[in-house]
């Protein structure tokens, strides 16, 4: 008996509407299981209720060690990665990947390993490039790689990145996605040949060693924005990845965004501390004036200096910053983010 298909879907910004529209057109008794990761972080999620109201295929938040069944939609719950292991769903609070938990890549990797050619990976609308590495792994193991046409997506970066880095089987508008999935699970649609599982070429002398098929370089003079651990660079196909010893993982674009967030946090904290110093120095000036009028001068000067530097630093934080995202960098048109 042929093994049933498993469809793994990843979405981020704009994903609620996209998932609603996709699920609304799936038929009752859909002969496959659907596993969904939406970037929701630790926030409460009403996605299963939204999907249940949209169409006939039942949806629920996954539970740990739950058996996977056909005709069911499983949604990763808040603040947990969802993966597949031995036909069951596992929910893990392991380190964030691509600045997200739940993240798409862990699900896609596990589905690729567990289901091989019976896996179907779908990347929908979203920012940055979570899902690109995992979709490549699904393709490498003989599965089917699909993205929402970036021109059709509310936020084209995520499907665009997957399209740029993975040999896709299908790139379709969202309106065509339900019909395509029905054809695929019923075996009525063809697909391109999958990428080879391993390169048959011997490793050249001087080439970086590999771990699970990824080439690793020496540790970098960069630290993890999440925990401060040293980062190790690796390359999977055309995608550069950075991992720390704790397990936090980033693509290059996500690391750039995470670095910016951390930089802004530290600079705003410095502004706050400078303002606090200015206030403290004024209080000390008042105390000094009670004992010796001339003694207040240095404290007042220190307060003025702190306020002046807090202002300059705040102006710096609130200036426009270049944020070379995937497509902006590729096209030579870097985008800007204003403070």
Q: Which role fits each region the language model picked out?
A:
Residues 287-291:
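Acidic, serine/threonine/proline-rich low-complexity intrinsically disordered regions
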Residues 1-286, 305-308, 313-323, 333-337:
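Conserved acid/base catalytic micro-environments in cytosolic active-site loops
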Residues 293-305, 328:
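Short, charged, amphipathic alpha-helical segments
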